[in-house]
Amino acid sequence: MSDPCNCVETGDCRCADGSCSDCSNCKCGDSCKCSKPNCCGKNVTCKCGENCQCGVGCTGPDSCTCDSGCSCK
């Protein structure tokens, strides 16, 4: 599996697919942690490419991914 992060001089990182633009405090080899505001109306922090919980109140499946902008499917 390829490295999900692209290291830059500032120490921040971006997801290889460019879906995460707010990644920070990420070390090379680690997954970017990004917070998206559009996950069932809640701010959700999850690892890019992995499922995160939208939380209670979601009308539908409560799983979401950073890759899809943390939008419930």
From Swiss-Prot:
Cite the entry's keywords alphabetically.
Cadmium, Metal-binding, Metal-thiolate cluster
InterPro entries in UniProt:
Metalthion_mollusc
Record organism: Dreissena polymorpha (Zebra mussel)
Supply the name of the protein. Answer: Metallothionein
Q: Where does Cd(2+) 2 bind?
A: C20, C26, C39
Name the protein family: Belongs to the metallothionein superfamily. Type 2 family.
Q: What does this protein do?
A: The metallothioneins are involved in the cellular sequestration of toxic metal ions.
| Residues binding Cd(2+) 1, per UniProt | C15, C20, C34
Where is Cd(2+) 4 annotated to bind? C46, C58, C64, C72
Q: Which residues bind Cd(2+) 6?
A: C54, C66, C70, C72
Residues annotated for Cd(2+) 5 binding in this entry: C48, C52, C54, C58
Tell me, using the record's free text, what induces this protein: By cadmium.
Output the Gene Ontology terms for molecular function.
Answer: metal ion binding
Where Cd(2+) 3 is bound, by residue? C28, C32, C34
Keyword Metal-binding assigned: yes
